Amino acid sequence: MSMSSFRLNDHHRSHAHHKRVREPLWLYALAGLCASLVGLGLARFAYTPLIPALIADKWFAPSDAVYLGAANLAGYLGGALIARRLAARIGAIASLRVMMLLASLCCLACATPLSFAWFFGWRVLAGLTGGVIMVLAASTILPHTPADKKGLIGGVIFAGVGLGIAASGTLVPLLLRQGLTETWLALGALSALLTLLSWRAWPVEARSTEALANHQPAQHTSSALVTMLCAEYGLNAVALVPHMVFLVDYVARGLGQGIAAGSAYWVLYGLGAIVGPLLTGHLADRAGFGPALRTAFLIQAVAVALPAFSAAPAVLIVSSVVVGAFTPGIVPLVLGRIHELIPHSSTDQRAAWAQATTSFALFQALGAYGLSWGFAHSGGHYGMLFAIGAAAAAGALAIELVAALRGRRV
């Protein structure tokens, strides 16, 4: 056989190998997208447009409906805290599958309002599934991803959050025409279907012995930079609260435009959330995660501040879409930055990501309660909320700039 034949065969084998590599990678990304859509998009964000219906149909009093929303935040924090222990006990892939099943069950269980305690317990569990999925999904897939594709693949994974936000403003109102019970059952069925479709799409999990064999203690500087990154991520959570919690109410009651107009801006927020992770992930692959993160904080600070200065429709549209884009779009940037700071240990990467997710959950809960308290005691001053959110994003940018300077000196 001639040398040209050998080269041709090698070329075909190489092409086939790369094709096999590419196909599972996108399959893994779609599994991650399904997980974030089920555990975060549907189990969490779909609850927001259900609140008026829960009150109108007399399932719960207005104050109880608010507490049920808080139950999800508490569960999310708990999920972030237990995720690594659960993965160590039964494996990350098994944990993700169990959490997706549990999230589906939570929606089905909420179809019957047996009591406040019953509903509260299931909403806590729904939040817990989201916390576990947020910690484990991407950190399970990204070790199988080439360095120049980590941003894009991370963006695909977290686009599920954006799809859930968009569904909360479009699909859920349509389902509510059939009734509350039917809506919860449909959300549960959709979650179960996504769980089934992604069941065999996850990567084969590596044994922990490999991670232990390659484990090297993190340097002090890297640890300090990761701590600073966690603080930035927490402040970013506070920056998102004004739009996530108050945007619809601001348009509907603050501007007197009604709930229909408020819901329209929420749909715009959701549309931004769909494309946000893909755009930020692509930017990170081109420019690096550090520069992309700093750019994101700067743009976000401006976008969050806009409603404090103008209520013009064009301004509110831009603000809704941009902040919506960064709600899930910031996630692949922070996760990718962790992989840059801790390049050689998947165990340390997962630990740092769990720490960052916990910081986000804690700051988000504190921010939601704190801004709600401030809003009530300010006589309903919406501008204050957006100003505080913008200041939090600016604070995250300041910390990241200090971290960048510190990293260059090492």
Task: Place the predicted regions along the sequence by residue.
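A late C-terminal transmembrane helix in Major Facilitator Superfamily
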Residues: S346-G379
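Conserved MFS/SLC helix-loop-helix module at the cytosolic interface between two early adjacent transmembrane helices
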Residues: G78-L114
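Cytoplasmic helix-loop-helix junction between adjacent transmembrane helices
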Residues: W122-G160
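Intracellular juxtamembrane helix-capping segments at the cytosolic ends
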Residues: V132-T145, G329-P343
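Extracytoplasmic gate region of multi-pass secondary transporters
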Residues: T48, V226-V267, P277
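Helix-breaking motifs and short loop linkers at transmembrane-helix boundaries and internal kinks
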Residues: W59, G91, T112-A117, G256, ...
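Helix-loop-helix hairpin linking two adjacent transmembrane segments in secondary transporters
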Residues: F116, A147-K149, G155-P203
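Paired small-residue
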Residues: A117-A126, A314-V322
